[in-house]
Amino acid sequence: MARTRAEPAGRARSRRRARRLAVPFLISGILHAVPWWRLVLTPSWPAEATVAAGAVAAVLAVGLPVLLVSGRRRGTGVLAAAGPVWLGVVWQLFVWTLAGELLRLVLAVTGVPDPLRARATALAVLGWTAALLAWGAYRALGPVPVRERAVHVEGLGPALDGLRVVQVTDTHLGPFLSRRWTTRIVEQLDGLRADVLVHTGDLVDGRLADRRHQVEPFGAATARDARLFITGNHEYYSGAAEWTGYMESLGWTVLRNRHVVVRRGTDELVVAGIDDRTAATSGVPGHGADLDAALAGAPEGAPVVLLAHQPRQVFGAVDRVDLQLSGHTHGGQLWPFGYLVRLDQPTLAGLSRHGPRTQLYTSRGTGFWGPPFRIFAPPEIAVLTLRRARPGA
């Protein structure tokens, strides 16, 4: 009897596992089939080219999920890079193939016949996608722009007026961004004359043994008052306890549900930090966002800057802090993913207000995750100059 009950349960688990395995291959199949259909088959290119392109698309459709999984397990090397690169390429091909239907419609209305219409559309889509990917790769891997912004803070003391908070976030040091890239970022940071330098999470994608040499240059970054680090969700995929310990060994203060106080004479500013919202379910003992603990013992009446990786953490901080600094969204990174991000987060990038007291600054991030492209979502290093609130503002 027990065996009879166990067999259906075992079959149910097998079916669930099969479905989980099938979904990535189904998605990959759609991403490859649509461009092949509209860019190769519909334009009636020579039969040999159509068949060859179809065979390549089929191999890539099956290979992409395998590359992504094997590359993630390996962590370094060609396999770790190949999957994300091709994912970015085929995603943009898929998106702009769909968008190309508008051009196809315009050409049809203006009387352009097929197969000329289909071929013109295919060439336009391929050319536009190639140019966009080249620009997106430069945006992701090239120089990181500095974005400066003044933020008016209620109750900021006159001695703290003009305090410079420099934010770097979502560096995602992995198979693409080398130690040289980190060194270049640190050189930029040192030129920005930070009073408070913060990293708001998602430092790396990988274990300490594989990535420490890429992170090490952050130990040379300088700031007048403090260098502060908080966890993002990716720390909990990569060994949060190891990475927080390593950042402390580099001289950074890790704010895990606690705060520091920046003083100029008798004027004070509280800078608090909390764990990422995923920390409590990560399985890492003692980790979990706790704003009450972060603010415990803070000087009464002093303005508060909160470091919280995800913008949506502002919902628990409204009217308890004056300014929250977050990352996580990457500004969408690959258009049109930004629209999906907005379903989960209150904002994509920039400064926003939440309640009468609280402002939120969301950085687009300094690095990138996955595909080494940034399409309509440039990276940034944010320089926020804190100013006393204007009368009546």
Region roles according to the model:
Residues 116-161, 165-167, 173-178:
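Canonical alpha-helical transmembrane segment with a positive-inside/aromatic-interface signature
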Residues 102-111, 137-148, 171-187, 217:
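Juxtamembrane/interfacial segments around transmembrane helices
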Residues 1-142:
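Non-catalytic terminal accessory segments
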